[in-house]
Amino acid sequence: MSMVALEWGDCFNETKEVIESWLSIFGATMERAEQLAPDFPKKMRSYEFIEFGPGLGGAAQLYSRYYNARGTLFDLPEVTNLRSIIYRALSRKKNTHASFEQFTNFDELSQKVKKTNKINFISTWAFTESPMEVRESFFEILNSSQTIMIISNAKFGEIDNFAYLKNLEQRLQHHIHISCDLSYLEKAPGYQKSHQLHIFVQKDY
């Protein structure tokens, strides 16, 4: 993973300190997720994940390496175009990086998911910073996911995100829901005390 981070940092001319901080946050979040839900890594490993709102795609590279998993990314067209430019730059530098299917159209993503055996869903902030109609369109994808990892702030506009996630728990009847605050990131830059990590894991029957 450190090699991926160093290559990413080289692409953006980031300092070693920034890269180390980024890796530390990623590692702490994965460690906390696995503490909360011991089945989380088993269900993530070697299967496909969807990341909603991956931004520039750095975390997706780490998820892919850490869990040996194939990634599918969903984002706004302008962000997807920018990310594609970055990935091409990484390729020109002959850096080792994972390739992802990228979608900006929900219907196309939905058709792809229907053909996928087992999926996982990840979103750090972006999903609960989306309108309710967007969230609702993803319900069947969430319901069919082995694991769901969402980091969320407390509110988006007038929407109470934590109440939304509690309601999602009631609707995802085949999943176990565990959540915690982000105190494990207390020393990280930009630490947000009021934000939360939510994990949903499909029950084994």
Language-model-detected regions and their locations in the chain:
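A short SAM/SAH-binding and catalytic strip from SAM-dependent methyltransferases
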Residues: 120-133
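Conserved class I S-adenosyl-L-methionine
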Residues: 44-55
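S-adenosyl-L-methionine
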Residues: 85-115
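Conserved Class I S-adenosyl-L-methionine-dependent methyltransferase catalytic core
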Residues: 1-41
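Conserved SAM-binding motif I beta-strand of class I
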Residues: 70-76
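Conserved SAM-binding loop of SAM-dependent methyltransferases across substrates and taxa
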Residues: 56-67
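Conserved beta-strand signature within the Rossmann-like core of class I S-adenosyl-L-methionine
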Residues: 145-157
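A short, conserved alpha-helix within the catalytic core of class I
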Residues: 130-142
